[in-house]
Amino acid sequence: MTLTSAFCATDSTAASSAPDLSHAGSPGGVCAIHQPNLFPRLSTLAKLYAAGRWIVLDDVQFARRDYQHRARLAALDSPARQQWLTLPTHLPYGRTTLISRARLADPSRSRRTVSLLIRQYYGRSRHWPAVRGVLDAVLDQFETTDRVSGIARASTITLLTALGWSGEVLDSSTIPTREGRSERLADLAVATSSTHYLCGTGGWRYLDPAPFDAHGIPVLAFHTPVETEDPLWRWSRGISSLWALSQIGPEVLAAMLAAQRDQLLLGGFT
């Protein structure tokens, strides 16, 4: 199995653009497979940004302790001061409910909460226009869906798009796969003609490389810096990436993530 570690660099550029929830991409390239997260953490966003294709893992069991329906907001000037932004969720099939079938318990109330809390936390940022663009695009989704996965998916795509990402987004529920955990991930990569699989630190703990090796698909290990003085990375595993966007804006944040992605690709494709 091919293993590459990705670290952060600081000297790259990337363009920003207005949020757009529709994406199309060409076959091949690097894929990341991850559950939909509400306003994801920077560590998650960085992994998805580094991939050319995000396969949304929407047909696994919903977990209330995970991030599908909640995000941890950090105060603009004091990231240690945090608050959960949570979407009350109804599980029609109890604990066995899949992420794709989880529903908003009160869509109107959730929409108001999202709007008020994000404005409260980041409305004073000089980069508020960029944050507001992300927020407005997500608020619009409450008018079209009551599915938690739909809101979480939209929040992630909108953040990625604000940073200039223009990859492909697919749902795992539309792709037939085998039952085994690693077999399933490998089948998703094969079915989408992906040439490499980008695996985060969480997935690496259980991943069996054999199903990927059988198809000649290298696995790239992705992680963000741990021993660093940069507050953006020190807080990247715990709080929503909205804080980073509010701190440095879309252009600088995109450049930072692009540098990390480029270093990964240079190491992984040699």
Give the location of each predicted region.
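Residues lining hydrophobic/aromatic ligand-binding pockets adjacent to catalytic sites
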Residues: 2-270
